[in-house]
Amino acid sequence: LFPENFSAQIRLADWYYIQGMLDESLITYEVAENLDSGNPVVQARLGRIYADKNQNKKAQAALEKAIKLNSKDAESHYQLGKLVSSEEKWGRAQSLLSNAIALDAKQAAFHYELGKVLLGRGNIELAQEKFKTALGLEPQNSNFIMGLALALVEKKNLDQALNILLPVSKKEAKNSEIFMAICNVYTKKGYFTAATGYCEKSLELKAGNYETMNRLAWLYAKKSSNLPKAFELSSQTLKAFPSRPEFIDTLSEILYVQGESDKAMAKIQEAINLVPNNPYYKQQLWKFKNVKPKPPA
């Protein structure tokens, strides 16, 4: 194979990419880029690989270039929109994803990603419409169903959210995310026993998921049950993410329930220091100071 054979480089790089050999694919695309840096296909694919390798700055630069070279490239608008959305730059993400849809409205994933952005911006009605559009194109896609459920939860339509999530959990009994989504809805309803069961199932399917571990520890604390396990889970999450206020809050709740109010107050103060304007954490501090915990069941 001669490196100067541009189309052969592209074919080889594509083959590596399809096989999941990202490093080899990247090297081959970089050779292709040296041969023709103004080729929009090369830039688009470099962007995709950098994104898959979590090299977001490089991915964004390549995708920006791809869009400049070919403004009709819907996929690059979508990929860049997704990356920008992950940084919560909602305005730019909305613009990019809207462009992607204008260029190719039949891609369900484009509508789904835009739905997530609209949800992030607090535009619940429009987000719900986008999730419905995505589901109209791919009715069985569980991610799209979870997206719609999130919008329903924001609208306080908790029973409707459960009605669409529960059937998926029967069909996709190994999908940890569905069980976690159901756990979150039951938590919102205040049905902590049901929520705990779904959260335990989710963690069983995907051990080591810190969000799930934190939620389960919090549920145990709320039920004043299984507190040693709650403390163990919470400690693990904080070891991995010592500055996550919601993880700090969980440990403070466990300490409070265990009757260690002074430690709980010191711990929740850490969360308040990180997000001084959060009213919930201030409310927690007041509770720890003024309300005696119920003795554990």
Where do the protein language model's features map onto the residues?
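Canonical positions in the second alpha-helix
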Residues: 1, 31-32, 65-66, 99-100, ...
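Structural marker of alpha-solenoid helical repeat scaffolds
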Residues: 1-2, 35, 69, 103, ...
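Helix-start (N-cap) detector for alpha-helical repeat units in TPR-like alpha-solenoids
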Residues: 6-7, 40-41, 74-75, 108-109, ...
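Residue-level recognition of tetratricopeptide repeat
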Residues: 14, 48, 82, 116, ...
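Register position in tetratricopeptide repeats
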Residues: 18-19, 52-53, 86-87, 120-121, ...
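Alpha-helical adaptor scaffolds
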Residues: 184, 210-241, 246, 253
